[in-house]
Amino acid sequence: MNLIEKICSNPSEYTLNVERLGECKIDSPIRNRDFIDDDERILVTENVKSLQLATERLGMTPSFERAGPHHKIFHDPAWSRVGIVTAGGLCPGLNHVIKGLVEILVCDYGIRTIYGIRYGYAGLIPRFGYEPFMLDTDTVDTVHENGGTMLGSSRGQQDTGEIVDTLARMNINLLFCIGGDGSL
């Protein structure tokens, strides 16, 4: 069963919109970039027959919100603290993603507090004793030359309440989760 068939057979299981924390009121600090409008969407599939079927059954064309920089943002970069975690199975390019993310956060958004969370979500559970470490453009400068993930990874479910408590204690208001199927 393809994704369109799954969506049509049980639409309540699939959320194609991203929930918002609140209204985005802060001007983006990014300059010289094309911005994404809030109403831009990407089709779930390019197959016209599947799209027609889904549109008839659902009364809408299945699509995702388009990712990318927006004119207005929610979190003020001057006060933002970021955590980056890699979880699930290893997949190619994790260190490239970490490097690119840190560079954009620092150079484009001006964020200065970025924590690398060790060993997946287990790194957010205090009893495991994995201390986070600071990431900056120097610490990720050559990381893309190595395989795997500089942060380490782990599999297995962790207690969501404990994770949220740790994020609150560390004042992390942005958490980037990178990885394979197990990262969600």
Show which residues each predicted segment covers.
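Short glycine-rich or small-residue beta-strand-to-loop segments that form or flank ligand, phosphate
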Residues: 81-91, 149-152, 173-179
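Helix-enriched interaction subdomains in cytosolic or periplasmic regions
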Residues: 2-60
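Glycine-rich oxoanion-binding loops at beta->alpha junctions
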Residues: 35-75, 122-175
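Mid-domain, small-residue-enriched loop/turn segments at the edges of structured enzyme/sensor domains
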Residues: 184
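N-terminal phosphate-binding or glycine-rich loops at protein starts, especially the Walker A/P-loop
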Residues: 1-24, 75-125
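An acidic- and aromatic-residue-enriched active-site/binding cleft used to recognize and process polar
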Residues: 119, 180-181
